[in-house]
Amino acid sequence: MRIGHGYDVHCLVEGRKLILGGVDVPYERGLLGHSDADVLLHAIADAILGALALGDIGKHFPDTDPQFKGADSRKLLRHVMALAGQKGYVLGNVDATIVAQRPKLAPFIPEMRANLAEDLIAEIDRINVKATTTEQLGFAGRGEGIAAYAVVLMERR
C-alpha cells in the first residue's frame, strides 16, 4: 500500500463558477484557473499521483497546454485513476479537507462524496470530505481564495 498527500489553492474572482468536488456551488465568485479550478479534485489527483510516484497534475495536465483550458477536473481525476489502475492500484480511502471562509459547504458534501466515489471507482464509505474555515485568518479567512488538502491510501489490486 502507498500513501499520498495533495494540496491545491486558487484565488476567488468574479465571473467564474465555483466548482468543488464536481459540484456547482452557488456563490458570487468562483476559482480562477486554467481548468475549472476545482481545488478538491486537484488535491486528490495530486495525492494519488504522489502515492504512485507519478509526479503531479502540473506534469500531466500543464496549464500551458490549451487542451486543458476550461477542463472538467472530474475528467482529469478519472484519467489519474486510469493511470493508477495501469500500475495495479485501487483507492483504499481518501480523506480531504476544503479550507474556505465562505460559502458554507456542508450542504454540498454528500454530492461531492458521490461524485468522488464514482470517479475514484470506490465505495462511498472510503471517501471523506470535510470543510473548515480559518477563523478569518490568512488568504482563505479574508475570502481571497480556497484551498484543499487530501490524503489517499492506494492499495494493490
Swiss-Prot record:
Q: What is its EC number?
A: 4.6.1.12
Q: Which UniProt keywords apply?
A: Isoprene biosynthesis, Lyase, Metal-binding
- The keyword NADP is assigned to this record: no
Residues the record lists as binding 4-CDP-2-C-methyl-D-erythritol 2-phosphate? 8-10, 34-35, 56-58, 61-65, 132-135, 139, 142
Q: Which reaction does it catalyse?
A: 4-CDP-2-C-methyl-D-erythritol 2-phosphate = 2-C-methyl-D-erythritol 2,4-cyclic diphosphate + CMP
Q: Pfam families recorded for this chain?
A: YgbB
PANTHER family (UniProt xref): 2-C-METHYL-D-ERYTHRITOL 2,4-CYCLODIPHOSPHATE SYNTHASE, CHLOROPLASTIC (PTHR43181:SF1)
Query: Which family does the entry's similarity section mention?
Result: Belongs to the IspF family.
Q: What is this protein called?
A: 2-C-methyl-D-erythritol 2,4-cyclodiphosphate synthase
Species of provenance: Geobacter metallireducens (strain ATCC 53774 / DSM 7210 / GS-15)
Name of the gene this protein is made from = ispF
